Amino acid sequence: MNNDNTEVLENYPQDGLQSNSHIIWKGIQSRLHKFYGNAIYDSWLSVLLYVSTESGKVLLSAPTRFIKEWILVHYLDQILKYWQDEDQSICSVDICVVSNQDPNLLVDIKDRVDRGIKGNCDNVSSPLDPRFTFDNFVVGKPNELAFAAARRVAESNSPISGSNPLFLYGGVGLGKTHLMHAIAWYIIKSCSKRKIAYLSAEKFMYQYVTALRSKDIMLFKEQFRSVDILMVDDVQFISGKDSTQEEFFHTFNALIDQNKQLVISADRSPSDLDGVEERIKSRLGWGLVADINETTFELRLGILQLKVEKMGINIPNKVLEFLAKNIKSNIRELEGALNKVVAHSSLVGCSITLDTASDILSDLLRANHKSVTLECIQKKVAEFFNIKVSDMYSTRRLRTLARPRQIAMYLSKKLTQKSLPEIGKSFGGRDHATVIHAVKQIEKLMDTDSKLRDDINLLNRMLR
């Protein structure tokens, strides 16, 4: 039986290994590599495999549905163009998702992308995401320790004193899984003989229960205790599951005794894992505990810039800044917002601007909506122009202070229900006439000063 992410190839005719179409495809791959560069080709296009050609229709395969859909949106037109350059009878190119267990496959996809697991660990490991590598991980203050520790584990041929286990913890979507996949990919690509097993704690529990029911518990133990590196994601899942905790405890001890490396992740520190036995929490804290903190604006912007670069598309930096300042919950949601904007632009055929991004993400932004207060406006404007909040109340008339103050008054008038006297009072006891003057001054300048207009539009979106 195939899973939901697999499309069966039985109905597709497949060419012989040495067919002319295979030769054409190799040439097209070279052209795609040259056209898009290493980053995009390695991340997306290198995993495409040629399947068949029939009645002017070319069929390629991708290892996952996500990769298939991304290529269909962003790169299919260029692939079709190159095919038609070689064969004018080609009218379309389609992509299917294949199973790494299908006997008709022309290459072993397991060794390419979909599995990425070595040795006899295939039955216990989960697939690795080809996007999750060290090169694709943006490092900043919130995650630099976790990144350095993960990289060190990957580069070392044996467990490092003080880093076994490596315990990564942080909120949802902050990069824990990315780093665990990156460790595995680094080892795989370095042609190391080390055996790796990566899986979630939920899958560990499921396989343990299955082994108990089928009376294969010794095989289960052998599989997990024969690895060189065991990586268990979201270990908080075993909370309250006594028998699973018992087996995890013994597996942990067995691997440590054999001088094998463990990498564990959770959404909280070992000491905060409620429902997990004290002896397990103690062992999880034996090595290096590295937290991944909430992202900063600079880190979020860097993540977006790297993602856009790998997509091979141009998006105005103001749009990226808008996303980075408004989508703060986690990296997964941030990247999802960018994907939504890019997909909408590609499908509808519109350019990406602040207005279109705001419209496309209106639901997401509304979900994060907070009531706008005068204090919030003053703080945001001060932060935007790199001045002190106290400058909003001061009597200093320096242009670098007066203009942001006027902008804050303008936004206060537009975004709140406060009266002019109330607004004036919040800006150091100024009267309503001062507020009216500020509003009119900003409105006048916005007609002629495009940069000021853009800044105010961006602030407007950030505050809503």
From Swiss-Prot:
SMART domains for this protein: AAA, Bac_DnaA_C
What Gene Ontology terms for biological process does this UniProt record contain? DNA replication initiation; regulation of DNA replication
Pfam families tied to this protein: Bac_DnaA, Bac_DnaA_C, DnaA_N
| Oxidoreductase as UniProt keyword | no
Gene3D superfamilies reported for this sequence: 1.10.1750.10, 1.10.8.60, 3.30.300.180, P-loop containing nucleotide triphosphate hydrolases (3.40.50.300)
Where is ATP annotated to bind? 173, 175-177
InterPro entries, per this entry? Answer: AAA+_ATPase, Chromosome_initiator_DnaA, Chromosome_initiator_DnaA-like, Chromosome_initiator_DnaA_CS, DnaA_C, DnaA_dom, DnaA_N_dom, DnaA_N_sf
Q: Which domain of life is it from?
A: Bacteria
Instruction: Give any Gene Ontology cellular component.
Output: cytoplasm
**Region (Domain I, interacts with DnaA modulators) spans which residues?**
1-90
Q: Alphabetically list the UniProt keywords.
A: ATP-binding, Cytoplasm, DNA replication, DNA-binding, Lipid-binding, Nucleotide-binding
Give positions of region: Domain IV, binds dsDNA.
346-464
| Chain intervals for the UniProt region annotation (Domain III, AAA+ region) | 127-345
Q: Where in the cell is it found?
A: Cytoplasm
* Annotated segments matching region Domain II: 90-126
Example GO molecular function term? ATP hydrolysis activity
Entry remark concerning the domains of this protein: Domain I is involved in oligomerization and binding regulators, domain II is flexibile and of varying length in different bacteria, domain III forms the AAA+ region, while domain IV binds dsDNA.
The record's comment on protein family reads: Belongs to the DnaA family.
Subunit-structure text: Oligomerizes as a right-handed, spiral filament on DNA at oriC.
Xref: PANTHER family: CHROMOSOMAL REPLICATION INITIATOR PROTEIN DNAA (PTHR30050:SF2)
Task: Give the protein's biological function.
Answer: Plays an essential role in the initiation and regulation of chromosomal replication. ATP-DnaA binds to the origin of replication (oriC) to initiate formation of the DNA replication initiation complex once per cell cycle. Binds the DnaA box (a 9 base pair repeat at the origin) and separates the double-stranded (ds)DNA. Forms a right-handed helical filament on oriC DNA; dsDNA binds to the exterior of the filament while single-stranded (ss)DNA is stabiized in the filament's interior.
Q: What is this protein called?
A: Chromosomal replication initiator protein DnaA
The root-end lineage is: Bacteria, Pseudomonadati, Pseudomonadota, Alphaproteobacteria, Rickettsiales
Gene that codes for this? dnaA
